[in-house]
């Protein structure tokens, strides 16, 4: 009896003591974190003191209204030459760069991708070419480069044309003589169709099979969720994010995306079990993207792990269709709003291709005016609006200003392409900026980034852009919808807040 009473009196005291200790430890942790925040912020302020910026809140940083990021960067381009700090919050700053000399210097270095900006993509696309750094990146880049040799790309032109024609046939069935259509979703299916056939040896048509729409939707969701997570201070922690509604949505989208790529890998492996197909592949002078991965041997002689294989497939599946879909959609919009240039392209294409029954690799170099218009559209609407680097060593820029190791530099291609000191009247669509006789800075136009880490598939992408523009202009006149003007917004690729609606007028 007395023993029970004794234990009863001690137990509440033990709880109280535990709570007191926990409170003290919590206060000490908060004090430590506060001191850490203060010291890191002081270091960042000193590190960026040579670069003026608009006023910011000490904790919340620069408050930018939702979907006003481009207006903000254009204001900075106008008021702060070459570069400007952007505080995401009190202890996180990045230097936005929009000057060609600055771009050339940073892209000529070997700084790694910014961990803060890119780590949130890892659960989705893994550590493939986009996220890898150092020697591993170099090995993978060298391994995959043959997939984009011109001998490999040549036969893809016909495949691209077939995919575009399927889309245009659908458009003819959907639209009347003069109807409005949201084009981005259709073009996304078409570019996914193309990449599945060219890079992943898939048969059939993505555009005619409804099951692929779930993958398209997953990519669209991850575009938004990844973008918003980077900018949310409360979602930096993986555990907290996993418990949030956005975290649950992201997990579901990751699963859908991975199911798609796993099926692609499984399907190709099954095809290669057939001895006839295997021998046909082995006799090829150049292998397709996925076959390179499946037959690859790293320098030590071992094959790629399943994890590394899927990371490269996930990376190129996304980058190989979504960026191109963005580029084509905005090119169509630019041509719709500049009818005189659209007609100039059409005349050039008609004289080259006639009715467009056939288009070949050699034709792609014979449409200079159309190429100029494509490049001008990519200048105004770059599919990838920015990339980030973490400085691995200090850097001094041509104007004498410098930054220390550890600072994140964001290369704003959108800011560069709209910089009036680089491109006079930057909002005016003028394809003659890209005429052969026009001169410009080597790093003033970077739709595919630059330096050693430029887009490995840039020639593939340019070919697809040309094929899509050529065949579409032979069958449709593109007209803007004045009631729904697209509003560009930055995501992982350039999107429109309200879709891209065009009036499609079938040509007789």
UniProtKB/Swiss-Prot annotation:
Activity-regulation annotation: Activated by cytochrome b5 and phosphatidylserine.
Enzyme class (EC, first level): oxidoreductase
Cellular location(s): Endoplasmic reticulum membrane; Microsome membrane
Modified residues (Phosphoserine): 438
E.C. designation(s): 1.14.14.1
PROSITE patterns the UniProt entry points to: CYTOCHROME_P450 (PS00086)
Pathway(s) served: Lipid metabolism; fatty acid metabolism
Binding-site list for heme: 319, 455
Primary location: endoplasmic reticulum
Role played: A cytochrome P450 monooxygenase involved in the metabolism of fatty acids. Catalyzes predominantly the oxidation of the terminal carbon (omega-oxidation) of saturated and unsaturated fatty acids. May act as a major omega-hydroxylase for dodecanoic (lauric) acid in kidney. At preglomerular arteries, may participate in omega-hydroxylation of (5Z,8Z,11Z,14Z)-eicosatetraenoic acid (arachidonate) to 20-hydroxyeicosatetraenoic acid (20-HETE), a signaling molecule acting both as vasoconstrictive and natriuretic with overall effect on arterial blood pressure.
Protein name: Cytochrome P450 4A12
């Amino acid at each position: 009896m007395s023993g029970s009473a004794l234990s009863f009196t001690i137990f509440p005291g033990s709880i109280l003591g535990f709570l007191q200790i926990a409170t003290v430890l919590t206060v000490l942790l908060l004090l430590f974190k506060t001191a850490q925040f203060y010291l890191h912020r002081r270091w960042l302020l000193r590190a960026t003191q040579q670069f003026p910026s608009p006023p910011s809140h000490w904790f919340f940083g620069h408050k930018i209204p939702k979907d006003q990021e481009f207006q903000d960067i254009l204001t900075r381009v106008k008021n702060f030459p070459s570069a400007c700090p952007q505080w995401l919050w009190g202890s996180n700053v990045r230097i936005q760069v929009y000057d060609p000399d600055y771009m050339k210097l940073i892209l000529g270095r070997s700084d790694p991708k910014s961990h803060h900006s890119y780590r949130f993509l890892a659960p989705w696309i893994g550590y493939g070419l986009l996220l890898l750094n150092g020697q591993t990146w170099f090995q993978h880049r060298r391994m995959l480069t043959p997939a984009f040799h011109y001998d490999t790309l040549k036969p893809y032109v016909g495949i691209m044309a077939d995919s575009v024609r399927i889309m245009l046939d659908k458009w003819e069935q959907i639209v009347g003589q003069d109807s409005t259509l949201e084009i981005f979703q259709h073009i996304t299916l078409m570019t996914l169709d193309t990449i599945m056939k060219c890079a992943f040896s898939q048969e059939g048509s993505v555009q005619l099979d409804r099951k692929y729409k779930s993958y398209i939707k997953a990519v669209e969701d991850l575009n938004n969720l990844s973008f918003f997570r980077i900018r949310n201070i409360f979602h930096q922690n993986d555990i907290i994010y996993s418990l949030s509604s956005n975290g649950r949505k992201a997990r579901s989208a990751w699963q859908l995306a991975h199911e798609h790529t796993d099926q692609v890998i499984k399907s190709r492996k099954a095809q290669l079990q057939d001895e006839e197909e295997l021998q046909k592949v082995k006799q090829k002078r150049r292998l397709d993207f996925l076959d390179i991965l499946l037959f690859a041997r790293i320098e030590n002689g071992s094959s790629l792990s399943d994890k590394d294989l899927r990371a490269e497939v996930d990376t190129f599946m996304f980058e190989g269709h979504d960026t191109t879909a963005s580029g084509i959609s905005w090119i169509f919009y630019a041509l719709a709003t500049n009818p005189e240039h659209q007609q100039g392209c059409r005349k050039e294409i008609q004289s080259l291709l006639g009715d467009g029954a056939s288009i070949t690799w050699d034709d792609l170099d014979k449409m200079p005016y159309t190429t100029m218009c494509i490049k001008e559209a990519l200048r105004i609407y770059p599919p990838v609006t920015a990339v980030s680097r973490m400085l691995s060593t200090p850097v001094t820029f041509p104007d004498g200003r410098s930054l220390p190791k550890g600072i994140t530099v964001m290369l704003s291609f959108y800011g560069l392409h709209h910089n009036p000191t680089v491109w006079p009247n930057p909002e005016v669509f003028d394809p003659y900026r890209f005429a052969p006789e026009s001169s410009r800075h080597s790093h003033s136009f970077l739709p595919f980034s630059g330096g050693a880490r430029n887009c490995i598939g840039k020639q593939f992408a340019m070919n697809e852009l040309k094929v899509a523009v050529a065949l579409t202009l032979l069958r449709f006149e593109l007209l803007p919808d004045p009631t729904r003007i697209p509003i560009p917004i930055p995501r992982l690729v350039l999107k429109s807040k309200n879709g891209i609606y065009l009036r499609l007028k079938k040509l007789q």
